[in-house]
Amino acid sequence: MAVPRNRHSNARKNIRRSHDAKKARHAAVCNNCKQAFIPHTVCTSCGFYNGKAVMTVEKK
């Protein structure tokens, strides 16, 4: 098996890992109910996607 010749420093390790953090999810506004939802998914509050009713949502 391959073995590293030299040890990587902590700084080099941390610089490599600086891009590994999870990114915050963006939110869009539904055109039908004006609630925030994740883009490219069905709106969870009204059930619309791309201006069309895709699923029925039970009202509380």
Swiss-Prot record:
UniProt xrefs under InterPro entries: Ribosomal_bL32, Ribosomal_bL32_bact, Ribosomal_zn-bd
Keyword Ribosomal protein: yes
Region named Disordered: 1-21
GO molecular function, one term: structural constituent of ribosome
Domain of life according to the entry: Bacteria
One cellular-component annotation, GO: large ribosomal subunit
Keyword field contains Aminoacyl-tRNA synthetase: no
Keyword terms: Ribonucleoprotein, Ribosomal protein
HAMAP family assigned: Ribosomal_bL32
Family from the record: Belongs to the bacterial ribosomal protein bL32 family.
Protein name as it appears in the record: Large ribosomal subunit protein bL32
Organism: Chlamydia felis (strain Fe/C-56)
